[in-house]
Structure formats: structure tokens, C-alpha cells
Amino acid sequence: MEINAQKLNEANATVEAKIAKQDVEKKEEKIAKELAKTMNIPGFRKGKVPPAVIKKRYGDKLAQDAEAELVREALDQALEELGIEKEAMLGEPRFAKYEKGEEVIEMVLEIGVRPNIDITGYEEVIPEYEEPQVSDEEVEKRIEELADAMAQFKEIEEDRPAKEGDLVVIDFKGTLEDGSEIEGGSAQNFELRLGSGQFIPGFEEQVEGMKKGETKTIEVTFPEDYPNKELAGKKANFEVTLHTIKEKEKINIDDELAKKMLQKEDATLDELKEEVRKQLKSEKLSKLYNEELKPKLVEALVEKFEFDLPKNIVDQEIDVQLNNKAAQMSEEEIKELRENKEKLEELRKEIEPEAQKSVKATFIVDALAKAEGINVADQEVVQTIYYEALQMGRNPQEILKAYEEQGLLPAIKMAMIEDRLLTHLLSKKNEKQEENA
């Protein structure tokens, strides 16, 4: 077997090999002898099956196994010659060529290798930033919102008209201009928060001003973009009877509120304000990190470090991004791409720079995470998936199984590592800024 291994750069290598027919036959003979020791074939004692019988019965399979084993041997020899550890090889080697002739098999394997990245000086590109401040007005507004959310609706005793913000209990029945009833357009003892925008424009505004026990016909027009096309743009009448008006009880902003919110018997309003200030600051900082600083940091890291990228990993990322684009295409566009290889190749070329950037960022994040001791346990990945599934009202086990089947768990884990790493780097920068201030 002739082997010619070559490193194209730090992240890519090729293996050219010629496997002679005799090599394949020898390997078939060896495999047949090993199988003969263990196989049970009627008419022969166990371990006494002649290799010729094995070859006759399993000829095609033996040939495939022999070729596969010789390919592995060629790969192992090439890796040893090039000084590449098996653990450093990324993904499966790809056949750029595999031609079977009568006397020889000619093949070319492409190998992707994990690049060595010198991350010296990464601290220099972590962006500086001013820590967000929280005003007293923002704190007061948030406490008022929290108090409003805690407040209960109570039926009013005074005889006054309904107004925006009230919770009213109504019966309604809707009909079109021709007198036909609107399907799903009727209800009894329906609770409606006036000003919520829950009903079509004009409905809630006309309920405002009604009193308890009053019945009124409300005229409205369904919007042109109303989801139900049969109703879009049509005029309708709703006969509405108002039964009850409720308003939110007023909650005093004081120590008693603080005790309820902080679940502490000795809590004070000042403590509550301090906790709310911290929460608001955390929210602002999170928004600053996610919307501005993290993208800026990734961009800076990608620009700072230069290294070779394994072609097979870049191609995989191109496939991912291509599939994402295809998900937004029409059937006609997808069909055209399938039938027009030149156009498909053009699209891949168009995607390639962004794919390279994504792969490069992943390698940098991986190297920095190791340097900074940042990791995410598999159990944390599962917990995150469970939490997000519950938030969406989905079955966590089904979501987890789907992600496993689609091979998405490593990508989710890497995204979590990236998020944790970038937050860690920015926090360290912030601490140094405070020390130097």
C-alpha cells in the first residue's frame, strides 16, 4: 500500500493512498480466518469452518470490511507520519476521491485538525463600558408596577360609569349587518379589562361610560387585517349588557408592602427600594451585555486572532446556515436550488464568509473557556432545556429527545459556554475598572 500524507496547513491535511488488489485479498483472507474460529455453519464443527467457505458465503461483505480496514490503516499511518493525534482530528475524514480499478484502489482523504490558537493578549480587546445607573424615578415606577400587579380587583359600591382600567363583567352577542350571528362572537359573564386592547378597536371605548345593569348596542368595524378573512373589513353590532364594575384596590407604598414583597417581617421600604434598584441595574447590565458588549467582544476576538480553519467543519457550518436559509424559502426557490447546481454553489460561496466567522468564533471561545476555567455540565444543559420547554408550555422530555435525535445538544452546550465566558470576561473588566477608579 502506497501512502502520501501531506499537511496543507495547521488545520487541514490530505492522505493519498493506493491499495493494491493483493492487499485487499490478503486482508480478506485474514478476516475470513478470524471469522472461521467463531462462526457456526451447518455441517462444520465450531472453529473448524474452512476460510474458503466463509469467503464464498460472505464474499461481498468481506471485501467491504477488508477495504474499510485498509482505509483505517492508511489513515492511522498518515496521522503518525504527520504527527497528528487522533484526538485532534475533527469530524470524519472525507473522501475527495475513491476509485476502484481492477488492480488498485486510488483514494484521497481530507482531514480536519483542531487548530492551535495562541490567545495571548485577549484581555486587550475586552471593551470598556460605563456601568448603567438607576434613577430614583425608575425605582419608584417599578415599585408602583409591582404593587399594581399585587392589587386585587374589587367590585365598586358607588354608582359610576365604567372607565379605562376597570375590570367589567359583561354579556355580549355579535351580529353582522345582515343579521347573521358571528361565530364565537357571543359570551356571558365575560371579564374584560378596559384599555387592554383585548377586543377589536372601538369596542372597549364604547363600553367605557356604561353603568351597572345597562344594555347598549355597540357598532364596530373589523380591521382589514383581521385574522378571520370572512370578518375582515365588515361592520358588526354587539349587544352588550354590563353586570359588574371592578376597580383595583389601592396599595400603599410603605413598609407593609416591603414586608409582603420581600417576605421578611422586619423589611422596610428602603430595603425594598435597594432590592429593586439592584434588580433594575442587573436588567440594564444584562441588556447592555447581550445587545452591545457581547457581540462587540466576539467581533473583536475574531478580528484579533488569525489561524487556519478545518475545511470540513466550515463546510458543516455552511450546511447549517444553508438549511436555515432554505427554511425561509418558497418551494419554488428550493426546487430551483436542487436543479441548478451552479446557483447552489453560488449561495454556498455567499454564505462561506459568515460560516468561517462562526467557526472561528467557536474555536476562540473554546480556547478562552479552557484558559479561564469556564465549563457547563451536561446536567446544566438538560436543566436549561427543561426550563425553556416549561416556559413554552411544552413537554420537556419530548423536547430533550428531539434535540438529542437532531444532534443539537453539543451546540446548545457551546452556546451556554460562550454566554458564560463572555459574561465572565466582561465582569472581570468591570471589576478592574472599579479598582482603578
Swiss-Prot record:
GO terms for molecular function: peptidyl-prolyl cis-trans isomerase activity. GO terms for cellular component: cytoplasm. The keyword Isomerase applies. It is an enzyme of class 5 (isomerase). InterPro entries: PPIase_dom_sf (IPR046357), PPIase_FKBP_dom (IPR001179), Trig_fac (IPR005215), Trigger_fac_C (IPR008880), Trigger_fac_C_sf (IPR037041), Trigger_fac_ribosome-bd_bac (IPR008881), Trigger_fac_ribosome-bd_sf (IPR036611), Trigger_fact/SurA_dom_sf (IPR027304). Residues 165-251 form the PPIase FKBP-type domain. Belongs to the FKBP-type PPIase family. Tig subfamily. Consists of 3 domains; the N-terminus binds the ribosome, the middle domain has PPIase activity, while the C-terminus has intrinsic chaperone activity on its own. This is Trigger factor. The lineage of its organism: Bacteria, Pseudomonadati, Campylobacterota, Epsilonproteobacteria, Nautiliales. The gene is tig.
